[in-house]
Amino acid sequence: MNNNSSSLSIGNKLFKSRLLIGTGKYQTLNQMQESIINSECEIVTVAVRRVQSSESSHKGLMEAIDWKKLWMLPNTAGCTNSEEAIRIAKMGRELAKLSGQEDNNFVKLEVIPDNRYLLPDPFGTLEAAEALIKEGFVVMPYINADPLLAKRLENIGCSCVMPLGSAIGSAQGIRNESNIRIIIENSNVPVIVDAGIGVPSHAAEAMEMGADAVLINSAIALAKDPKSMAEGMCKGVHAGRKAFLAGRLVEQPLANPSSPCTEISKSSYVQ
């Protein structure tokens, strides 16, 4: 979408921050809280299945976040088919309401039957998206970097598309650059690069390409110093966005001197 607006528009909500972060994988809730603050994010994802399970790592998570300041993005992580994703999305909407966000219909849609590579199922994602949109959800689908699928999801009413930069948690950065560029160029909804971002330069690269936002979890939560990495990611996103808006110098194969070469004697050149 890459418009020049200072705000990120998703559904009927406007956000100043273009960095979304996840709440999983932190060693402690305190680390998560500090990282959220340093990231300056406004949207945090919550894995509905994990929050409602007995996993000790997620106990107290909902209470540790100030939902008056942050917008909850329930996600369907762990769902392997469309039926399961639809059910978990509805549970996520109720979870958001319980946190005080009565008008929150957001869902990050993940349908991942593949446990090894964690690649999203395009057919299951499309099927679930169609059903959830009919039920009033603001659907934010996680997809492979497939321009045709991205356009199809936009056309059925998804509020954004979230192509992966590379495999989840791989920290490989943007490995699907050409396809993501096509998605950005042809999209009329925000494009949020999700998965694979490992360092701030990866986040900056995504934003320089014209992505509207990035979503990051593992790179922050599993860093040696999560709160410092969160700050770095925040600055990377800002830098990349500014570079995109400024308009970068076009790459070219030959040198182009920054100082004039007029009135320089030919004899002064090194032979």
From Swiss-Prot:
1-deoxy-D-xylulose 5-phosphate binds at residues 169, 195-196, 217-218. InterPro entries: Aldolase_TIM, Thiazole_synthase_ThiG, ThiG. It comes from the Bacteria. Pfam families: ThiG. Its EC number is 2.8.1.10. Its main location: cytoplasm. Keywords: Cytoplasm, Schiff base, Thiamine biosynthesis, Transferase. It catalyses: [ThiS sulfur-carrier protein]-C-terminal-Gly-aminoethanethioate + 2-iminoacetate + 1-deoxy-D-xylulose 5-phosphate = [ThiS sulfur-carrier protein]-C-terminal Gly-Gly + 2-[(2R,5Z)-2-carboxy-4-methylthiazol-5(2H)-ylidene]ethyl phosphate + 2 H2O + H(+). The active site is at residue 108. Pathway: Cofactor biosynthesis; thiamine diphosphate biosynthesis. One of its GO terms (biological process) is thiamine diphosphate biosynthetic process. The keyword Transferase applies. GO terms for molecular function: thiazole synthase activity. GO terms for cellular component: cytoplasm. Gene3D superfamilies: Aldolase class I. The keyword Ligase does not apply. It is found in: Cytoplasm. Homotetramer. Forms heterodimers with either ThiH or ThiS. Belongs to the ThiG family. Catalyzes the rearrangement of 1-deoxy-D-xylulose 5-phosphate (DXP) to produce the thiazole phosphate moiety of thiamine. Sulfur is provided by the thiocarboxylate moiety of the carrier protein ThiS. In vitro, sulfur can be provided by H(2)S. This is Thiazole synthase.
